């Protein structure tokens, strides 16, 4: 269904993010990275999309890039405090699950 929505509205960052996150959930991190990077390019100020992208980078052992994005999210005005708290933990401990 997400693939069909993406074909209908190819430049919708939220749909692209959802598709990328679905790949992440299925542990297809390489495919997730492609979609989430595109979503971030379309919506660079969205903290959730950036967090999804950073999580994916972490799972691909691109830890420096992931930490850079997590730090960036902490500076965004639209990031809710709960997300900032979770990101602060990620900056200290990383993500529990790895490849």
PLM ranges: what are they?
Residues 3-7, 38-41, 75:
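Conserved structural position within tetratricopeptide repeats
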Residues 13-14, 47-48, 81:
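Helix-start (N-cap) detector for alpha-helical repeat units in TPR-like alpha-solenoids
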Residues 18, 52, 86-90:
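Canonical tetratricopeptide repeat
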């Amino acid at each position: 269904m997400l693939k069909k929505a993406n074909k209908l509205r190819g430049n919708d960052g939220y749909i692209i993010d959802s598709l990328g996150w679905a790949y992440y959930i299925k542990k297809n991190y390489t495919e997730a990275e492609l979609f989430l990077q595109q979503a971030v390019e379309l919506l660079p100020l969205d903290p959730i999309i950036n967090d999804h992208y950073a999580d994916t980078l972490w799972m691909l052992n691109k830890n420096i890039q992931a930490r850079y994005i997590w730090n960036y999210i902490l500076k965004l005005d639209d990031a809710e405090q709960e997300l900032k708290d979770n990101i602060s933990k990620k900056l200290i401990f990383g993500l529990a699950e790895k490849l």
